[in-house]
Amino acid sequence: MLPTAMRYSHTLLKEVVQPGHTAVDATMGNGFDTELLASLVGPTGQVFAFDIQEQALQVTKKRLAEKELLAQVQLIHQGHETLADVVSGPVHAAIFNLGYLPKGDKAIITLPDTTKTALEALLTRLAPKGRIILVCYYGHAGGEAELKEVHSFCQQLPQEEYNVLSYQFINQRNQPPILFCIERKNHQSSAR
């Protein structure tokens, strides 16, 4: 069977993240992506995980402690738009789950402007062959506007520098999530 957007996002991360790398979870949520990234970068790598909700930090901290992965993760109680102040680079992978915290306050959502700010900061830090993955949930109020912003942002990236993938199930009801993957091309191969 075809993988869900979430499962496919993890496949895309596993293909590029190596021990010792730096990765970003721009929307920590319940910590599943943070846990995966921490296991992939290993004790010599580093993960920066962002969320504005204290609940997300507590759940993620507990999850990471249980798996003995907390040492390589910085849990940051700030929005992903502050990424430029925290992460100096290079970043080998980043993931966003855009929408609201599952089982959380549905009035607290990610926003087009803050997501764009974070994406711009990540692009300046993205290592060659690095990936930024965005899983866009858009069935809530404000979700369509953010999806439109992400799609527009991705579509305008120069093909000489980036490959951009869109992955979605087009015959499913109830707005299934859409995945975007931005991959920086290898500088040497793009010069040919």
PLM region spans:
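Conserved glycine-rich SAM-binding loop
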Residues: 29-31
